[in-house]
């Protein structure tokens, strides 16, 4: 390859990479203020559903219209250091690595920030490339958003069951009420299904969901409202 052609190719690749990076920054900046009508995880589920979905349900609501019980339940279940870390829980990552070295059952260590980045922007792949891009988006979100916006985004796009996206749709589907009126027990059931909402049954709750929801309620009692206060004070 001629040197001049190689330089042009490298220059073109560099400009393309720079444009891609800038587009990610702009996207995250806009989503600080704009609620997304669609996101990558939901789009992939629509195109390649694990099973047939009769109806897709989703209603966006602001964080203040989501029960504080559910806010605390997902923190207790998924990321108890959410208010303290900067997107990555290094203690949880270290613990998961040690566990996975000696167990056939893999344990994850993704924070709520990482899960939000995955649901918003990423495809369902376990490659190092995907994890690297996910980490980049997580960093951008932590730099540009406050914790309450991350929690609001998570609770509005996470899947609580086949085709059921967000807290409002889940509350109305399972309990016939708005998300603002969810009780601690109901919130813990929803949070218990989050590891695999296509597998774990919320209503009537499977034995696993019953057991895990009881554990979540105990964790909620230990964390207390002070945890949520830290999240909201970070605005």
Swiss-Prot record:
Protein name as catalogued: Biosynthetic peptidoglycan transglycosylase
Gene behind the chain: mtgA
SUPFAM superfamilies to which the protein is assigned, alphabetical: Lysozyme-like (SSF53955)
Pathway terms, separated by semicolons: Cell wall biogenesis; peptidoglycan biosynthesis
Family to which the UniProt record says this protein belongs: Belongs to the glycosyltransferase 51 family.
Any single biological process term in GO: cell wall organization
Gene3D superfamilies referenced in this protein's UniProt entry, alphabetically: Biosynthetic peptidoglycan transglycosylase-like
Record field: catalytic activity: [GlcNAc-(1->4)-Mur2Ac(oyl-L-Ala-gamma-D-Glu-L-Lys-D-Ala-D-Ala)](n)-di-trans,octa-cis-undecaprenyl diphosphate + beta-D-GlcNAc-(1->4)-Mur2Ac(oyl-L-Ala-gamma-D-Glu-L-Lys-D-Ala-D-Ala)-di-trans,octa-cis-undecaprenyl diphosphate = [GlcNAc-(1->4)-Mur2Ac(oyl-L-Ala-gamma-D-Glu-L-Lys-D-Ala-D-Ala)](n+1)-di-trans,octa-cis-undecaprenyl diphosphate + di-trans,octa-cis-undecaprenyl diphosphate + H(+)
Gene Ontology MF annotations: pentosyltransferase activity; peptidoglycan glycosyltransferase activity
Keyword NAD: no
Entry-linked Pfam families: Transgly (PF00912)
Keywords in alphabetical order: Cell inner membrane, Cell membrane, Cell shape, Cell wall biogenesis/degradation, Glycosyltransferase, Membrane, Peptidoglycan synthesis, Transferase, Transmembrane, Transmembrane helix
Recorded GO CC terms: peptidoglycan-based cell wall; plasma membrane
Organism encoding this protein: Aeromonas hydrophila subsp. hydrophila (strain ATCC 7966 / DSM 30187 / BCRC 13018 / CCUG 14551 / JCM 1027 / KCTC 2358 / NCIMB 9240 / NCTC 8049)
Enzyme Commission code: 2.4.99.28
Protein topology in the membrane: Single-pass membrane protein
Stretches that traverse the bilayer: 12-34
Xref: InterPro entries: Glyco_trans_51, Lysozyme-like_dom_sf, PBP_transglycosylase, Pep_trsgly
Entry function: Peptidoglycan polymerase that catalyzes glycan chain elongation from lipid-linked precursors.
Main location: membrane
Keyword Iron-sulfur: no
Localization in the cell: Cell inner membrane
């Amino acid at each position: 390859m001629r040197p001049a052609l190689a330089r042009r190719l490298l220059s073109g690749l560099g400009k393309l990479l720079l444009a891609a990076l800038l587009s990610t920054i702009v996207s995250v900046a806009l989503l600080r203020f704009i609620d997304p009508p669609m996101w990558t995880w939901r789009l992939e589920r629509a195109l390649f559903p694990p099973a047939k979905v009769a109806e897709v349900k989703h209603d966006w609501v602001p964080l203040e219209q989501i029960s504080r019980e559910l806010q605390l339940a997902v923190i207790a279940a998924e990321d108890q250091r959410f208010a303290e870390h900067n997107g990555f829980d290094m203690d949880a990552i270290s613990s998961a690595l040690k566990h996975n070295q000696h167990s056939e059952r893999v344990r994850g260590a993704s924070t709520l920030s990482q899960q939000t980045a995955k649901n918003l922007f990423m495809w369902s792949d376990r490659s190092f490339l995907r994890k690297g891009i996910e980490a980049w988006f997580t960093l951008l979100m932590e730099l540009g958003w406050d914790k309450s916006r991350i929690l609001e985004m998570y609770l509005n796009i996470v899947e609580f069951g086949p085709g059921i996206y967000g807290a409002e749709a889940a509350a109305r589907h399972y309990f016939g009420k708005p998300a603002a009126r969810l009780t601690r027990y109901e919130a813990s059931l929803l949070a218990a299904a989050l590891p695999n909402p296509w597998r774990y049954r919320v209503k009537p709750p499977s034995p696993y969901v019953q057991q895990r929801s009881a554990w979540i309620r105990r964790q909620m009692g230990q964390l207390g409202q002070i945890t949520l206060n830290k999240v909201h004070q970070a605005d």
